[in-house]
Amino acid sequence: MSTVTITDLARENVRNLTPYQSARRLGGNGDVWLNANEYPTAVEFQLTQQTLNRYPECQPKAVIENYAQYAGVKPEQVLVSRGADEGIELLIRAFCEPGKDAILYCPPTYGMYSVSAETIGVECRTVPTLDNWQLDLQGISDKLDGVKVVYVCSPNNPTGQLINPQDFRTLLELTRGKAIVVADEAYIEFCPQASLAGWLAEYPHLAILRTLSKAFALAGLRCGFTLANEEVINLLMKVIAPYPLSTPVADIAAQALSPQGIVAMRERVAQIIAEREYLIAALKEIPCVEQVFDSETNYILARFKASSAVFKSLWDQGIILRDQNKQPSLSGCLRITVGTREESQRVIDALRAEQV
């Protein structure tokens, strides 16, 4: 009699799945954590809601209204979820038939688009970006047949640059009546002028992902948003869990999105941008650094001589960066989160000491 293991009982695509390697999963014993694009210091909040014996609202009114006002959209165009990662998955679950439809994304980019699709059993198609990391519109057009959701990260993680807005318009015209285009704006607070939120009236098939993890300094809260037209939001509401946000999360999110919270976020952004420019200038003078790429975000991508050795050397000194070597076209590249001035100096001093 054959023995069936628990693993044999699992879905085939899950057995073959490589889980997303988050910064926390990769570990490390550092005291300078510059691998997850988090804000470097904690922000304090006081909990005001004490009704933990009751289930929370499915879509907390104060959070939705505050975010709609901040983003310049209507409350009916906002869905709140457990981080933007849940938004990525909800869009696939709502629009893609497993085993039939596909998603499309353009590497090098964020890794969760493929993981979410593979988990659900939806095909992934890739169209690598051009040499300047802009969209290959002809390549996308050639592969659109059967694609229901297209993910474009702008500013892009891990490269740090914005996607050309005219290319976004072309993509939205190419996909009209065929697919949802998802603009992942996790880092848009660092370049708010580039947001596509004002385009929702023009494009019924546009969805925008946002988060409180970056500029709002609340990565531990797990709170994200999908902005889209009401028809899209209503479909996502059919597949979201009944209570996605716990009461304490909703409480803190509403405070972070108050007028005072927005002012504090913008002050943090200004500070991070100033620190980013300081770090970019310093990196350009370091012998083991071959190239520093422009950034519109809270991280910097740079190409190094002997990048694996540099990565390990800093790791051993407790400075944890994010290795991007395995991403298409990013050979020799490491991503560095912009931290405090003290953390920047630790990185600079360690890199200057590298023998190349």
UniProtKB/Swiss-Prot annotation:
The modification N6-(pyridoxal phosphate)lysine is found at K214. Pathway: Amino-acid biosynthesis; L-histidine biosynthesis; L-histidine from 5-phospho-alpha-D-ribose 1-diphosphate: step 7/9. The keyword Protein transport does not apply. It is an enzyme of class 2 (transferase). Transmembrane segments: none annotated. Its EC number is 2.6.1.9. InterPro entries: Aminotrans_II_pyridoxalP_BS, Aminotransferase_I/II_large, HisP_aminotrans, PyrdxlP-dep_Trfase, PyrdxlP-dep_Trfase_major, PyrdxlP-dep_Trfase_small. Belongs to the class-II pyridoxal-phosphate-dependent aminotransferase family. Histidinol-phosphate aminotransferase subfamily. This is Histidinol-phosphate aminotransferase. The gene is hisC.
